[in-house]
Amino acid sequence: MKRRYAIGLVFLLVCVARSDASVTPRHVTPASMDKNTRELFQESMDLDAQLYDDNVKLVHRPGFRSTASRTGSYMVRESSWYALGLLLRDAPGDRQRAADILDAVLKQQYVTPGVKWYGTYRRTPEEPDPTGNPVMWRGYDPNWRHFIGTTLAMVLIEYPDRISPELAKRMYEAIDRAIDGEMKEGRLLPSYSNIALMYGFLWDFAAVHDKNTDWQKQSAAWTESVYGLFKKYDAFFEYNSPTYYGVDLYGLALWRDYGSTKRIQTIGTEMESILWKDIASYYNPRLRNVSGPYDRSYGMDQESYVSIVGVWMRTVLDAKIAPLPPIAASTDHVADVWFAPHLAILGTRIPPDAFEKMKKFEGDHQLHKQITEDRVATAWISRDVIFGGESTNKTKDVGTGSQFHPATVQWRTPSGEIGWVQLTQAPMIDATADEHGIKISATGTVRFRIHAKDLAQTKVSEKEWELPGLRIAVDDDAKNFSIEKADDAVDITYSGMTVMTLGINAAH
């Protein structure tokens, strides 16, 4: 009885608190942006305009002429991001183009109840409808519910006067389908950090708009579960990802700006601050990169691919020092720069001490971070080389094509470009880093990829990697060693091993 009373009291307090936390538009305009944010926003919009198809009312995939047969030539999610940017800019013709795009995006939502993909969207209009029992991510992407849904919510909060009532009604209905579909699919966990944060905001937004008390109660419990999991170690389960940390920051900014209660806003602000400090501790401004280890990574050099953390940092750093490459249609993962309108509206809130670390290297330091009960990340951040390792208590392996890289090294080569090493394949693994290098424990086959301009394959042997600007001494018990060329890199494989030490020394 006491427990029921306590739960009821918490819910009552949550509902009462909703009246204390008003959600108001930020009224951001290009003129009100600071220089760096405005430059980023303009680059994003210029690329959108370059790739927009006025007949289809969607943006083309960058490089679509070479990839269309494999992935489709249009991007539904990213088109919704362009629409938000158009409404923000509000130049002549922007409102109509945004309305056309939003109409086209909404037509790509799966609206048949009772299927697992209900409420999500086609990734491209060329994508066939799922049939039978499709494999998640291949047959459909459930996360488009949240990437697109949160964008629609931002439009409805910020620019209700710039769209028609009919379009607004359709957008609210689309958000409801997304929430209903996610609830019924039941696949999402609070540990799936970036999606869990977006879902928490979107669920709260829909609950308040619909005056749905069940959703209000459930969304409040969801946000608390995400926060509670984070606070165990002040870390997200998807740890240290230059792309998905950027989505985490987006979700947290939605909480702190648009959360319907002071509680949501407060815990969103708290987690956002902690996350920025964590990012800053791994960042080396001389190398313009966040060190590994990476739980999920699409690249190893933020000077050559677009990471969403890099997009965030570009809003407060000049182009010449931000961890972001020049923006062109050919830039790796360039579509993520289309996240810029969201960031421009929400604003970048980096704690002052963390911001200083992003501008000036403050000295060599060791990092040791508990992620979960089983997982610990370690890294050595020095002036000329950064490297990290993740110990998993032998609970995680690294499969072919994995985004998980539990051992990484980055440095600047004599050419001026970033060189890197990433562990790309391993059985259950533990890796730890300190100022001397990386120690690895894994029984079986371990593979690394090494990339560095002017790398000579003949200078890479089992016991020593003589790389441009870096020397790594290897102490291992492997039974076999092999090396092969892989595009602009080399793959090296140690088979039949149990332990290995990489002794890392920058060549001055």
Q: What does each model-identified segment do?
A:
Residues S19-A21:
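Boundary at the C-terminal end of the N-terminal hydrophobic targeting segment
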Residues V23-F147, T151-P160, E166-M183, A319-H508:
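Ser/Thr/Asn(+Pro)-rich, low-complexity disordered segments
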Residues M154, K169-F355:
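Extracellular polysaccharide-recognition and catalytic grooves
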Residues M1-I7:
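Bacterial N-terminal signal peptides that target proteins for export
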Residues C15-A17, N393:
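N-terminal low-complexity, intrinsically disordered patches enriched in charged
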Residues A91-P92, D161, N212, T261:
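Alpha-helix boundary/capping and short turn/kink residues
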Residues G8-C15:
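Bacterial N-terminal signal peptides
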